[in-house]
Amino acid sequence: MSKPSSSPFFSETTSRLQDETVFFSLFPDSSLSSAALQSLHLEIIDFVSPFTSPYIWQHEPFSLSIALSSSCACTNTAIPHLHGKLKYGDNLEDEWFAVFLLFRISAAFPSNSIRVWDTDGEFLLIEAAFHLPRWLNPETSLNRVFIRGGDLHIVPRSRLPDPSLVASLRFLIERGNESRASDSVQSALKNRISDYPERAWRNMHRVRVRVPVSVAQVIRHEPFLISLAVEGFYDRDMDSMKHAAKMEKFLSKGREEKLVLVLVKMSRAMYGQLVQQKFQAPNCYPMPSVSDRDAFSEAELGMKIACGMEMMYQQRKKEGEDGKGISWSKYKDNLEKYGYFEGLLSGSKEYKRLMENAEEYHQKSSSFSRTRDIMSAPVRRIDEILALPYSEDDFKGQEVPASDNDSWLYDGEDELNSVLQERQKEMEFYNSKKERKNKGKEKQEAGSSSDANMNNFDLGDISKSMQQFMHKVSSYKGAEVPENRDFKEVSIDVDRFMKDIESMLGSQGRDEQADDDSDGSEGSSMDMDFDDVEDDSEGEESNEDAKESFEESYYGAMNEELKNSTLEKSFENVNQQHSSKQNEESSKTRDEKDDEFTPVDADFNLVKNLLESYSSQQGLPGPASNLLGLMGLQLPKDSGDKN
């Protein structure tokens, strides 16, 4: 068994919560007197009895007790209320059946607020996790979650940032309409408990077993003790196994003891715990022949029940727990402790009246608490039952119905898959809803941004951004967009670069009159020390003239090469808009026009090609939008006008 763990939802409690246990507290709107609280208690008992009477609980039954002070783990404040706990163990049906009962109680008694939690904390929120407000989490849920009027209520953080229990209860009374959880949260929880109580009743399994007469006698008088017998068998240890080997209480005659056939009702969880565990019958146990398969199967299951009953009985007796149930004397002591008699003298008229009311309440509530008392102290009750006269003949001649079909035990995979698929659909719906919301938000932001910038969008920004992008220095990994950092631009001495190119091409870099006998002082500019060059105005002018002359020669040679190719037709040329150029062009012959190679407008072609690529994407992701996005540009929507 895992270690007990305290819930993060209730970190203020000093005691550690029991594992596999659900806790609940019911707070009336007004501070009731002890008599009024007792009356409310009885009304609730009468209300839930029709739901719980056909049900066999796994460990202990659903019950409520009166707390005139802070006697439960949910609060340190002295608020008169009803509280209870239910250990559900391996049977989660018990926990959700209890939740169903609490919702029904809150609907039938709307002037009460109910809290429910377990070792996982606010498990109702876990069930509706996909529908909760984002601010609600284990740290902010303390004193916020209640059941009231048949609905779940969550005290809003905007109203009470750090609520106390008293403040939250007051808020529920005064502004309950503001605290009601959303319809999606209500639906998630209501769907979880919509099949109850029928689902709880369907969870019962009836099976034929052969048990010793003494065990049959106990089960006939107290059917719910089967849960303690199964618990004793399932949680057995080496010490309790010693009691099963002897069977002193329920098999006093040993192998001479007769087995009788009875029908036992238990939960499906109990049945699974019995069937799935292999257990060798004690030597003293009278098992039938294996050849009779039906009788042997019935006796084998009955043997496990009988051994569990024996182990439970002996263990409880050893621990001295018999006789510790709630009695009248203990109940009276509690009344005196909490001031029920208001300091009245014993024997006075008013004292007798209060005493009569207390006795009447105890008698009425004892029928409901009787099951709880017996299960908390079963030894005494078992002794009382076995002290009555009984024999094997009491169980002979009775028609025992057939066992329920237990195919559900082996078909659980289908049910599990169904639950998983339901959860998967819920998760997919949540994710799709979230995705639609994010897309809508992005569209709205993009739309407002593009609409605002539509008229102010400058196509020149594309070429400028591309130039900046091309001049960035990238690493060995390739072209990268710098994030929160600026790369230094390439530093180059243009004059020296041009002189070096000039020297290599030989177009303008050498003196035509130089002779081969030169001493090399006027050789290649590659050998020149630019730090030694005299920095005078004549030198600068000479360098500028040489640079311009080289550029004209270089571009002229390049155009001459390109004019004979078809490359020119794939680009847009420079628009000749100046009138002087138009006049010059008109004076030229057609042959001269054909020989010309009109320069290409690189920026215009860049923008044109990017826009055509962007338009062909038809609003979908693509290379153009990705590249422009990396450069921080967002184009307006394509209007479809190609002009």
Curated annotation (Swiss-Prot):
Coiled coil: none annotated. Residues 428-458, 501-600 are annotated as: Disordered. InterPro entries: Ecd. This is Protein ecdysoneless homolog. Disulfide bonds: none annotated. Residues 446-456, 564-580 have a biased composition (Polar residues). Belongs to the ECD family. Residues 581-592 have a biased composition (Basic and acidic residues). Residues 528-543 have a biased composition (Acidic residues). Signal peptide: none annotated.
